[in-house]
Regions:
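A conserved catalytic-core segment of Leloir-type glycosyltransferases
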Residues: 2-12, 22, 27, 31, ...
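Active-site-proximal flexible loops/turns
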Residues: 11, 120-125
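Intrinsically disordered, low-complexity cytosolic loops and termini enriched
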Residues: 15-16
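Short amphipathic alpha-helices and their capping/turn segments at secondary-structure boundaries
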Residues: 1, 126-128
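Short N-terminal targeting/anchoring amphipathic segment
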Residues: 105-122
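Short alpha-helical scaffold segments that flank and stabilize functional sites
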Residues: 36, 125-126
Length: 128
């Protein structure tokens, strides 16, 4: 499982520059996950990010699950604020994101073997 909270993360192609937080790191996360799923010892990879509903952006960001491939998915967790927030405001959303992630994981048939946290905000969530 990859945790990545900032920017507008969706299946490729990456929409570079639509926000200050949507850049090369989004491409890196998608590429890392797509390489990971190609391994013989990996059967499923999810990228967990923040779900939001904001007219300025693609409605896909409000979809709870987006399939990139048969075994590679983006899971979006809602937070208290339903709209897009930039990284400077993201800290206030971490408690509700963490709660949503714990709820999501408690409903999964299998827990992730590995959690890869991208950046400090995701690391704070992963530590719980």
């Amino acid at each position: 499982m990859h945790l990545a909270l900032g920017g507008c993360l969706k299946a490729p192609p990456v929409s570079y520059g639509i926000t200050p937080d949507t850049g090369g790191h989004i491409a890196y996360i998608l590429e890392a996950a797509s390489h990971q799923i190609r391994r013989d010892d990996v059967s499923n990879v999810i990228i967990v990010t923040r779900r939001f509903d904001d007219r300025r952006f693609d409605p896909i960001h409000n979809m709870p699950i987006e399939d990139i491939d048969e075994n590679l998915h983006i899971v979006r967790i809602g937070t208290d604020r339903k709209y897009y927030v930039e990284k400077e405001e993201l800290a206030a959303e971490l408690p509700s994101f963490t709660k949503g992630l714990i709820e999501y994981l408690s409903n999964c048939q299998r827990r992730p073997d590995v959690i890869h946290a991208h950046f400090a905000d995701a690391a704070q969530v992963a530590s719980v």
